[in-house]
Amino acid sequence: MLYHKEVNWEKRFDYALNYLIKRDMELTEHLWQHLITKDKPKYDIDYNKLISICKNVYAHKQPHLYVFEVATDDNTGMIIKACFRTNYDHKRDISIVVKDGVIITAWLNHYKDKHINLNKEKYLK
């Protein structure tokens, strides 16, 4: 099931990254392609900075960390995927999707973008 911080949230979801972030993260081919081609401004992400952010999250040293979306296993209720947002630079935040030690995707947003066009229908209520 899919949950969003603005729709339906359980306190345990705030700790999702404790289960999903690993010391050595892998990247999907999908994300690698975006990092290599930088085909859109939102993918203008420095690989080393991305890995550094994930290592800081793993070490509980990343400031301004905001977990905003979580997926759970339909049968067990265990957290299987999480999306979080944190500072990237003075103008942008980065959102990162992780699952079992793998960075599925990541993108940049202006730090003031609050995602007001959220589609609440796709989240459990």
How does the language model describe each region?
Residues M1-K125:
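Ribonuclease/tRNase effector modules and their secretory precursors
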